[in-house]
Amino acid sequence: MEEVPFENAMQRLEEIVDLMNQPTTSLDASLALYEEADALMRICESRIRQVEQRVRELAEKRHESSLFEEQAVVR
């Protein structure tokens, strides 16, 4: 599955849940939907991990910067 924007993947996951909850959805269709949902969840989880890592990096830089500023004030 090609790279899908996070928001689009989440929207499609909601659609899949709705489709799977319909009593008219066949077993084979449910399986296909489940497989699609699995791929979309992997995309979302990967993107969340990327964002979390970037936030950690930014927080660490901010912390290092404030330590540097504190040391400069002490001198």
From Swiss-Prot:
GO CC, any one term: cytosol
Chief localisation class: cytoplasm
Alphabetized InterPro entries for the sequence: Exonuc_VII_S (IPR003761), Exonuc_VII_ssu_sf (IPR037004)
Protein location: Cytoplasm
UniProt keyword list: Cytoplasm, Exonuclease, Hydrolase, Nuclease
Catalytic activity from the UniProt record: Exonucleolytic cleavage in either 5'- to 3'- or 3'- to 5'-direction to yield nucleoside 5'-phosphates
Gene Ontology MF, one: exodeoxyribonuclease VII activity
GO biological process, one term: DNA catabolic process
Gene3D superfamilies listed in its UniProt record: Exonuclease VII, small subunit
Enzyme Commission code: 3.1.11.6
The protein's assembly and partners: Heterooligomer composed of large and small subunits.
Its biological purpose: Bidirectionally degrades single-stranded DNA into large acid-insoluble oligonucleotides, which are then degraded further into small acid-soluble oligonucleotides.
Family: Belongs to the XseB family.
Cited NCBIfam families: PRK00977.1-4 (NF002140), xseB (TIGR01280)
Protein's name in the database: Exodeoxyribonuclease 7 small subunit
Record organism: Chlamydia pneumoniae (Chlamydophila pneumoniae)
Phylogenetic lineage: Bacteria, Pseudomonadati, Chlamydiota, Chlamydiia, Chlamydiales
